Amino acid sequence: MAEKKAEKRAEKRKFNTEAWEPKTQIGRMVKEGTISDINYIMDKGLPLLEPEIVDALLPDLEEQVLDVKLVQRMHKSGRRARYRATVVVGNKNGYVGVGMGKSKEVGPAIRKAIAHAKLSLIKVRIGCGSWECGCGYPHSIPFTAKGACGSVKVELLPAPRGVGLVAGNVAKAVLGLAGIKDAWTKTFGDTRTTYNFAEATFDALNNLNFVRCLPAQKEKLGLTEGRVL
């Protein structure tokens, strides 16, 4: 049911490059065709300040709403309630992002969360790091990674081919949209907090990018960054 709703939202929001009026230099370069690959932006460390840049360069991006909650805060005039949405976006092929948005209505909260998730997009390292497998095909993660957010801590471990994603529903959604098919996970803390759980999983995936590898190790692990060929 959730996947069908996501597909309908994606159809409604098919990106029109011609109608887009970029506000930043990078956005203008993308619209002109000077930049045609999102890897160029990420490798150069350029800031993603417009979600439309991601829409233009990754048209196959999918989104999934993980959670919508009613939250409250105290004000001198009384309690003020807003909706908080948690969303994960990815193309199931090496790119993923997690975002949160708040608003007085559900729709705007989800749209804000989607925009935030697109701006936080990262490349994911995918490989075959399990000693039980060694197939060399990028289907899992290349090595163990840890991430944290709030009280939640997540540890990702490489798994052999065919195991699947042994994880909670939130972590499974993040890993699945990142393009990882097999992985084991360990979780600690209050994983009922959806955003913290999603962000901790996202942090673990991001930490994979900070591990240095020799060319021979990359070849042995079948390591790829971004799109899996």
UniProtKB/Swiss-Prot annotation:
Which keywords fit this entry according to its UniProt record?
Answer: Ribonucleoprotein, Ribosomal protein, RNA-binding, rRNA-binding
Gene Ontology terms: biological process? translation
| Manganese as UniProt keyword | no
Please state every residue range assigned to the domain named S5 DRBM: 61-124
GO MF, one term, reads: rRNA binding
Record-linked InterPro entries:
Ribosomal_Su5_D2-typ_SF (IPR020568), Ribosomal_uS5 (IPR000851), Ribosomal_uS5_arc (IPR047866), Ribosomal_uS5_C (IPR005324), Ribosomal_uS5_euk/arc (IPR005711), Ribosomal_uS5_N (IPR013810), Ribosomal_uS5_N_CS (IPR018192), Ribsml_uS5_D2-typ_fold_subgr (IPR014721)
UniProt-listed SUPFAM superfamilies: dsRNA-binding domain-like, Ribosomal protein S5 domain 2-like
Q: Mark the transmembrane ranges.
A: none
Any GO CC annotation of this UniProt entry: cytosolic small ribosomal subunit
Similarity comment text for this entry: Belongs to the universal ribosomal protein uS5 family.
List the NCBIfam families: PRK04044.1, uS5_euk_arch
Q: What is known of its domains?
A: The N-terminal domain interacts with the head of the 30S subunit; the C-terminal domain interacts with the body and contacts protein S4. The interaction surface between S4 and S5 is involved in control of translational fidelity.
Q: How does it assemble?
A: Part of the 30S ribosomal subunit. Contacts protein S4.
Family annotation (HAMAP family) = Ribosomal_uS5_A
What name does the UniProt record give this protein?
Answer: Small ribosomal subunit protein uS5
- Can you name the source organism? Methanococcus maripaludis (strain C7 / ATCC BAA-1331)
Species classification: Archaea, Methanobacteriati, Methanobacteriota, Methanomada group, Methanococci
